[in-house]
């Protein structure tokens, strides 16, 4: 077939998820689109941000009040030593009650903020999933030819989840962290500008140190990830081909390769972990030197009555907490990059070109005859490479048209055009005298029944799967359809008969049995036009005979398109379309084609020579 599937590279392990640290191509544009999605929930969103700000503003007052308690205790102790009184426990009790109320209020606003932001992000995720689900029904089949299923699934699941989770955490965290920095700085300056200057000196030193360590460790982290990928790839390869490895005595080679990859992983891992592990103790060392300087300066200022003794404790608390929001902002920025990258992939999907809309006043036939006409049809999966050129054919109601050709010749192309899975480049296809574009897609596909080798059955009972062809069918109608398809006897051999539940991949029944069930489903739907895919040698002879009998019964009185694998079974077909490398090379019936002594004759003779 000419439509070579071009898989976009999946964005994560096995096509599911994004790579960590992936950045959006258009950060500003993507975030603008994202904010438009938040607009319906802007009240909750803004109230959530306001709650975050209020919570932080209340919280930053806490250390100052703690310092007042210490000052009160110290002052009371000094008064007692000097014989001027003692500690005022009533004042301390009131201050503690105030402190408790402040922290409780801050927690309440923080909880409310989390509840509101979680609601906004999940509502937005719900809205995106709903739009994506509606979008997927509008996409042409060509979209799925050009994009891997793993990549599409990743956009539906991982990207939306990443977007929801990171948006919930990053925006509110970033806002509250900015407010924390400003709040801590204001409170520190209110205590002493000299101590604030002393505390801020150590921050550039810590940042320089972190940058040096990160630069040194980065190459080892890259090597670690590369080695980890080699180890994982080797293990997956060896386990999936374990039988072949043992059959060819490849265990020693496999172990030798694994040891080589594992040694590389060990070397790069311990170096990267050692260097990254140095950051915390070194930054703590610089931070502690800064705290010592703050304490000495604070003691000096206390002696000179510039600050109270409790202010030293308050200032140290602010200093220790000051670097936390800085690191949170850094993490939030990285998270926002992930949010934008995930959102960009989601918006790319939502912006994909859709199928041409159905006509506003479609044709609805009460009695479908099954007359099909191809008129000067031109088509190519790639517009620059036409595979069907100026093809015309008239098929009477009830006639059988076989489509033959070697494997990969593109035999399903014609039936895909008939089902309007793809739009024609030129020409027209008519059913009962009406252009297929005059029908709705659902109306068109209701006229056509498909029985393909790759039989699609969903997780559920056999009865539910058969009724999929006609949801309103009674149990008796389902059973009659199963009998007509020669599958009723097989169903009764199962423990639960028609109520037997098929698993997700229908692996609890054979391929031939799956195809018999799809024949029964087609019988129940009772279409006037059929598309059939013959059984191949992958099923046993008895099942193949049953499938052929079922198909013969199904084709009676119906216009049928048969994708043929054995040319002996379609000698009596009214029309035969011969395809090779995606092109139609011959058209006629069996006798006409054999007289031409062309490609069909070679195919036919080759099959019988093999037999």
Region spans (language model):
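Cytosolic ends of transmembrane helices, especially the final helix of ABC transmembrane type-1 domains
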Residues: 118, 227, 250, 274, ...
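Juxtamembrane loop-to-helix connectors within ABC transporter transmembrane domains
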Residues: 30, 38, 70, 117, ...
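Transmembrane helix-loop-helix hairpins at lipid-water interfaces of multipass membrane proteins
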Residues: 45-109, 190-194, 305-309
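An intracellular "coupling" helix at the cytosolic face of ABC transporter transmembrane type-1 domains
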Residues: 40, 141-142, 160-167, 171, ...
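ABC-type nucleotide-binding domain
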Residues: 351, 357-359, 365-611
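Hydrophobic alpha-helical segments in the permease module
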Residues: 99-106, 110, 203-211, 276-290, ...
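Short intracellular "coupling" helices and adjacent cytoplasmic loop segments at the cytosolic face
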Residues: 16-22, 122, 130-154, 158-160, ...
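Transmembrane helices of ABC transporter permease
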Residues: 44-57, 68, 169-223, 294-307, ...
């Amino acid at each position: 077939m000419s439509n070579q599937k071009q898989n976009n590279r999946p964005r994560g392990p096995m096509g599911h998820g994004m790579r960590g640290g992936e950045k959006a191509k258009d950060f500003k544009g993507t975030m603008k689109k994202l904010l438009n999605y938040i607009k319906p929930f802007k009240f909750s969103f803004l109230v959530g941000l306001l709650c975050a700000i209020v919570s932080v503003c209340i919280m930053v007052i806490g250390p100052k009040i703690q310092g007042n308690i210490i000052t009160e205790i110290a002052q009371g102790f000094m008064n007692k030593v000097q014989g001027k009184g003692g500690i005022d426990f009533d004042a301390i009790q009131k201050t503690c009650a105030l402190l408790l109320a402040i922290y409780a209020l801050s927690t309440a606003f923080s909880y409310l903020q989390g509840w509101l932001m979680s609601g906004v992000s999940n509502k937005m995720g719900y809205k995106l999933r709903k739009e994506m689900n509606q979008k997927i029904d509008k996409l042409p089949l060509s979209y799925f030819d050009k994009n891997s299923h793993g990549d599409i699934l990743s956009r539906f699941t991982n990207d939306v989840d990443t977007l929801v989770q990171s948006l919930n955490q990053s925006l509110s965290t970033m806002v509250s962290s900015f407010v924390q920095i400003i709040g801590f700085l204001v409170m520190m300056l209110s205590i002493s500008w000299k101590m604030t200057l002393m505390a801020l000196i150590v921050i550039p030193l810590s940042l320089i140190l972190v940058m040096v360590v990160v630069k040194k460790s980065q190459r080892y982290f890259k090597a670690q990830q590369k080695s980890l990928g080699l180890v994982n790839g080797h293990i997956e390869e060896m386990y999936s081909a374990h039988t072949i490895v043992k059959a060819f005595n490849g265990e020693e080679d496999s172990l030798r390769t694994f040891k080589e990859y594992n040694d590389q992983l060990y070397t790069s891992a311990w170096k990267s972990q050692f260097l990254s592990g140095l950051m915390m103790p070194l930054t703590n060392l610089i931070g502690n030197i800064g705290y010592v300087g703050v304490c000495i300066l604070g003691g000096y200022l206390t002696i000179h009555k510039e600050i109270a003794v409790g202010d030293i404790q308050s200032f140290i608390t602010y200093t220790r907490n000051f670097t936390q929001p800085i690191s949170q902002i850094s993490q939030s920025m990285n998270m926002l990059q992930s949010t934008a990258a995930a959102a960009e992939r989601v918006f790319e999907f939502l912006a994909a070109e859709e199928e041409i809309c159905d006509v506003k006043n479609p044709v609805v036939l009460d009695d479908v005859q099954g007359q099909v006409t191809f008129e000067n049809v031109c088509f190519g999966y790639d517009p620059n490479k036409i595979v069907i050129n100026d093809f015309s054919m008239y098929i009477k109601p009830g006639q059988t048209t076989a489509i033959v050709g070697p494997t990969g010749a593109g035999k399903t192309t014609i039936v895909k055009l008939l089902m309007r899975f793809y739009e024609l480049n030129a020409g027209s296809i008519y059913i009962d005298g009406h252009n297929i574009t005059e029908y709705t897609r659902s109306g068109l596909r209701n006229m056509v029944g498909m029985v393909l080798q790759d039989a699609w059955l969903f997780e559920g009972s056999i009865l539910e799967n058969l009724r999929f062809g006609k949801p309103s069918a009674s149990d008796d109608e389902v059973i009659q359809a199963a009998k007509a398809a020669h599958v009723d006897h097989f169903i009764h051999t199962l423990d639960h008969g028609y109520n037997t539940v098929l698993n997700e991949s229908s692996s609890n029944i054979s391929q031939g049995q799956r195809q018999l069930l799809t024949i029964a489903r087609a019988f129940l739907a009772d279409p006037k036009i059929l598309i059939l895919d013959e059984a191949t040698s992958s099923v046993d002879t008895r099942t193949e005979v049953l499938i052929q009998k079922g198909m013969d019964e199904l084709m009676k009185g119906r216009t049928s398109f048969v994708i043929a694998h054995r040319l002996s079974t379609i000698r009596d077909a009214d029309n035969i379309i011969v395809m090779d490398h995606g092109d139609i090379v011959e058209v006629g019936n069996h006798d006409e084609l054999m007289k031409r002594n062309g490609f069909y004759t070679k195919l036919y003779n080759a099959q019988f020579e093999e037999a």
